[in-house]
Amino acid sequence: PGLAFSGLTPEHSALARAHPCDGEQFCQNLAPEDPQGDQLLQREELGLICESCRKIIQKLEDMVGPQPNEDTVTQAASRVCDKMKILRGVCKKIMRTFLRRISKDILTGKKPQAICVDIKICKEKTGLI
């Protein structure tokens, strides 16, 4: 309910409702000491997950090479998370959930920031030229 007007697909809706760090090791040390820090913490976590997304997509683009096609993107996507060390769990979740969209965006030449905005992990930066 409500998805029809939100512009979100069911997969985007589930990710939007899920905490960006659910079960991810690198986020476990981010628990706030006091409840008033929750808003700041959420912004910091979103910043961390956005930065992680950009790093993962950049690594994927580097592995795909200068002339990507569906096969090279799929092959690179199956290997990229093993190269991400601490971001491996987040990488696998992103690839499992959004590979089709990421692949399409890479094939159209989008940059990592734009791809992470498309999959709703990063917010669009406003006011920048």
From Swiss-Prot:
Highest taxon in the source lineage: Eukaryota
Signal peptide range in chain numbering: 1-6
Induction: By interleukin-2.
Disulfide bond positions: C50-C122, C53-C116, C81-C91
Principal location: secreted
GO cellular component term, pick one: extracellular region
Protein keywords: Antibiotic, Antimicrobial, Disulfide bond, Fungicide, Secreted, Signal
Protein name stated in the entry: Antimicrobial peptide NK-lysin
